[in-house]
Structures are given as C-alpha cells and as structure tokens.
Amino acid sequence: MSYLLPTIITTLLILLALIIWFYVKTQTLRTQLQFLSEQNLEISNNNQLLNQEQIGYLQKIEQLQCKIEYQAQTIKDSEKIREESFSSAKAALFDLGQDLSKQLIEIHKMENTAARELAEKNIATASGKFNSEFERLITMVGALNKDIEQSKGTVDLIKQSLLSPIGAGLLAEITLENILKSSGLRPNLDFIMQYGLTTLDSGKLRPDALIFLPSGNLMVIDSKASKFLVDKQDNNMSLNKTMNYHLKSLANKEYAANILTNLNKKDQSFNNVMTLMFLPTEQAVEKVIAADPEFLQKAWGCNIFPVGPSGLMNMLSFAKFQITDHRRSENYKVIIEEVRKLLSSIGTMADYSQKIGNNLHNMVTNYDKFAASFNRNFMSRVKNIQKLGIDSGNKAMPATLERYQIVSSKSEIIEVEAENPPQIAEKL
C-alpha cells in the first residue's frame, strides 16, 4: 500500500489540474458564448429594425398604389363625365382629353416605379451593411481568440525566462544599469559597466560596475540574483544555499587586491575598495535575510555590503555629492586663473577705451576750432565777395558751420564692503 500512495496522490493532482483546466476553459467559453449572445441579440434587434423599415416601405408602396387606383378611378369618372357632358363636342377636344389622360397615367406609373426601385435599393443597402457587420464581428472574435492564445504563450515564456538562472542574472544587471544611468553620474568617467580585468594568477574577473570616488576610493558593484528570488514559492533552504555560495565566490574573488593591482598598472591610484552585492529588488533583500538571518553579518565580515535598489540609490547620491564637490575643488584653481585673466582683459580694454576717448576729445576740440575759424574768417570774406556781385550759382552757401563741444566728467565709484573679506584673502 505504501508504494500505491504516491501513485494515488499523483493521479489526484493530475485530476485536480484537469478539473481546474476544464473549469477555466468552461468559464472562458461561457464568457465567449455570453459575448456572442449579446452580439447576436444586438444583430437581431438591428434585423427587427430593418424589418420594421421594410414594412414601412411596403405600407408606403401600398398607399401609393391605393392613391394611384383612386386617381385612376377619378380619371375614369372624369372621362365618363366628359363623355356625358361633351358628347356633342368636337372630336378634336375629345382626342385632346384622351391624350391628357394617357399622359397622367404614364406619369403616375413612372412615380410608382421610381418609389419601388428606391425602396428595394434601401432594403438591399441595409441588408449588405448587416451582412458586412456580422462578418466583421466574426473576424474580430477569431482575432481576439488568437491574440489571447499568443498572449498566454508570451506570458509563459517571460515567466520561464525569469525563473531561469540566466534570466534572473540579466534582470539584476539591467536593473543595476538603469539605476546607474538615472543617478546623474557620467558613464566612462564616474563609473564603468562590465569592467574586465586579469587577476594575479591570470584569472578573468568582470565586475558589473566600478564607481570612481574621490581621494583614491573605489566602489565595486557585483549584481547577484537567483531564480528563488523571483519565485513565489518558499524555497528558503535553496535560497540560503545559493546566496551563501554567491557570497563565498564574491569573497574569494578578492576584488580589492586584484582591482588595485590592475588600476595601479594604468597610473591610477586607489587606496580603499568597497564591494557591494546588488540584489534586484528590496523584496529580494528581505527574502535573503528571512532565509539566513546571519547573512548580513557574514557579508559585512567579508567587507561586502548587500544592498537593494533603494540602498544603492542612497549610496550613489552620496557618491555623486562627493564627486561633484571634488570636481569643484579641482576646478577652483582654474577658476581663479580665469578670473585673473578676465581682470587683466578688463584692464587692457580700459586702456584702449581711454585712448579712444582721448582721440574723440581731440577730434571734437580740433573740429570746434576749425568751425570757429571758418565762421569768423572764411565766411566773412565770402559774404564780402557776394556783396561785390559775384553769385555762387545754383549751390547755396552755408551760413555757418555747426560747432560741437564735448563734456567730460569722472564717474563716481560706489564702494561696497565685501562679505567675509578674510576668507577671500585666504583663498587668494
């Protein structure tokens, strides 16, 4: 009996799965049937409306027929009255009345034919629209069913990818790269992704990210993930084993010694290396701590700091502040030198402007002297010559030249006490 128990349990589980699948399939088909029933009801209502319109058109046709019959009867009665009244009339008048009657009958026949053709055309148009809408609904239902099947396959594929070790690792690396790009740090200057290096024993290491901090500090980030972190089932033992293996392998890599050796060969001086184990979600950090409460103590003992996205963002914000402050302090001397050059340029410009002002002053003074001499000496002689009878022709002589004077004044300089002058003096 003991060996039949697993078989029975397996059979029951299979039956339960089949029942659940049958139930879900039944609910899906029931939903589709309800949707088709509603569509069929709507189509039936449209068909009833079309039938009512058809009945209305038929009634109008019958009314027109009755009207035509009534008019025909009236025409016949009028013909009889004419025959009785104008029996003694001339044959020409009788022929004329008969022709008019025929024309009226033909007109009424044409009106009846046009009305019938219009009604048949409207009915055919409505029937065509109904058939096209019904075919469109059937096509939409088929396409919707196909899309549902494709979406189900896509969801299963994504789920299988996330539950695989490679998929979980790629998820952690993508999350890390997105956080670094949104942190404000400069790629290939403040941080490097997927930095490859060779160890002392010719081994290959490839940390996910290196962040260069001021004062010879370096932050190494290595993302770790496991399918048990994204799996909803409780696999604490497997998760504990996997994450402790990651911690051991990360500690055995000796990032600090290998990275310092590798970077010092490239004329880059780093003194302190801090290693971060990045987990893709905060829930992953909580699951690791729940699986092994001593995991953080073990990691800290190896100088490794497990962090999630929130913890990493906090550390990156502090790192960005340090990098920005260090960059500002490095650029301080350059800024002072540029300010000195600017002040020197201002002095040179002031010298040139002083020379230009002096030249303008000399030009205006000399012009004023010339205008005074011209008006006083030259123009007086010209007037004397004109008095003697010599005309200047069509060109009118000016009375006097306008004189100009330039006024120079010294600008007042308003002195303002500088804030914290001792500190500025110390920096300069």
From Swiss-Prot:
Segments forming a coiled coil: 25-84
Any one Gene Ontology BP term: DNA recombination
Keyword presence, Nucleus: no
Protein origin, superkingdom: Bacteria
Keywords for the protein's UniProt record, in alphabetical order: Coiled coil, DNA recombination
Family recorded in the similarity comment: Belongs to the RmuC family.
Protein name (record): DNA recombination protein RmuC homolog
Lineage: Bacteria, Pseudomonadati, Pseudomonadota, Alphaproteobacteria, Rickettsiales
